[in-house]
Amino acid sequence: MWRIGIDEAGYGPNFGPLVMSAVACQAPSELVEADFWEVLHPAVGRCARRGGHLFVDDSKKVYQPGKGLAGLERTVHAFLSCLSHPGCHTLADLLQCLQTQTSVGPMIDEPWYHGGTTVPAAAAAADIASGSQNLKDALAQAAVCWGPIYSIAIDTPRFNGIVDRHGSKGAALAVAVVQLLRACLAHAPADDGLVIIDKHGGRNFYAPILQELCPDAWVVPIQEGMTSVYEVRWPQRVIRVILRPEADATSFEVALASIVSKYIRELCMEEFNAFWKTHVPHVKATAGYPGDATRFLADIRPTLERMKLPMDRIWRKR
């Protein structure tokens, strides 16, 4: 059976991409609702756990500004090593490896993006290799097959286009969820599964969004509210979908998806800040969140106007 987790990074900022990721694995039916922190405990652990484990936790606990990307990076690249795609040596490689077949090329309209940032950027190769081997051993012991992993990076121009078409920034999350789920479920069309999605915003009703997965599917609401639960039924399979707040605290796959999303967004923001630093040498780097983003915009505005860049190329409307 499939276990799939979905989470995002960058929904609230004014600058930089919204990144949403899905991580999936096939597990024996008796493990479909098991605690994977326990199942894979020889190789992985939460941030409070000591030792050489890969950290799988809320990305805000794994990564803290000023402490570098090594914690995120070691986990992401160890899990990527379980997939059968070529190695990733740059940010552009990483985005190419993780994009869905239907997603638009990443950041094609961002003036700051070049994709040449080398990855891994901070974690030592030996640390990644040891974590990867421990993970593969734990997965084999549990008879769990890891993958696929997908990410969608919605750059500012596309984010603003979605807002213009739908009148809501929440539509960007819906677009990404549908693309990611379609890509994951295409891997084994006859298998049942469990999908857990970290819920954001005030939406409680998701049946219309899930119906977009396939016109032939039958979406059955089981519960709608703070936590919303659905069954998506096809003639040959049933997928249970759970949307709940702070799911990265209780779902291993959601926590891992949050780490993948955060890692990609932080790499993107490094390129963002480096671009503006070359044009405005005195400007202090930003994470792109409200408040500080306003300060950053004021610092770069004269250069922005001189470059004749439209505001909606770099600044989100919502």
Residue ranges, per PLM feature:
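RNase H-like, Mg2+-dependent phosphodiesterase core
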Residues: M1-R318
